[in-house]
């Protein structure tokens, strides 16, 4: 009886290891991962904002786009949002848009966060992580600076100071 229990346990462990190995191989070789590189055209997407309006990246052609991927739980994201909000009206008048892409959180959480900080720039939610994956985003926050022609000028991972954000917004003015 004891030998039979050991055999069953070994079989279960072996099956779990094989499943983990199979998943690892599948995830690394067969799933589509498109990392965006500096100089490439930013992948187009359509996402809805908190009011239900659709935002298509190509609709922003002719303007610089500060494309920021973030989460409400992300402390570095929380630190840079007020700076982005303060600079948004200044640079919007100069042809630069800030578009904040939340990474798949419930709309209510995002709305509460936006209200708490009084955010005025467009916030869209990537419910299925399709845009996140298309851009190859890893840690948050990650920001893509996109020029007026839709080309990625720079990719920034990690939190930014107000001065950093200002310099980046300056760099993508049309």
UniProtKB/Swiss-Prot annotation:
Disulfide bridge positions per record: 74-77
Residue intervals of the Thioredoxin domain: 36-174
Membrane topology, record value: Single-pass type II membrane protein
Pathway as given in its UniProt record: Protein modification; cytochrome c assembly
NCBIfam families attached to this UniProt entry: PRK03147.1
PANTHER family: THIOL:DISULFIDE INTERCHANGE PROTEIN DSBE
Name used for this protein in its record: Thiol-disulfide oxidoreductase ResA
């Amino acid at each position: 009886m004891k030998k039979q229990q050991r055999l069953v346990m070994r079989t279960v462990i072996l099956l779990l290891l094989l499943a983990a190995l199979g998943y690892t191989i599948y995830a690394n070789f067969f799933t589509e991962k498109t990392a965006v590189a500096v100089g490439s055209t930013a992948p187009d997407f359509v996402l809805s904002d908190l009011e239900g309006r659709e935002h298509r990246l190509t609709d922003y052609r002719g303007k610089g786009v500060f494309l920021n991927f973030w989460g409400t739980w992300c402390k570095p994201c929380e630190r840079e949002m007020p700076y982005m909000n303060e600079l948004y009206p200044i640079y919007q008048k100069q042809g630069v848009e800030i578009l904040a892409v939340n990474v798949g959180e419930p709309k209510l959480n995002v709305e509460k966060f936006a209200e708490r900080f009084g955010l005025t720039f467009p916030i869209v939610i990537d419910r299925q992580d399709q845009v996140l994956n298309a851009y190859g985003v890893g840690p948050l926050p990650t920001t893509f600076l996109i020029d007026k022609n839709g080309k990625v000028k720079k990719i920034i991972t990690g939190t930014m100071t107000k001065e950093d954000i200002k310099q980046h917004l300056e760099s993508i003015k049309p």
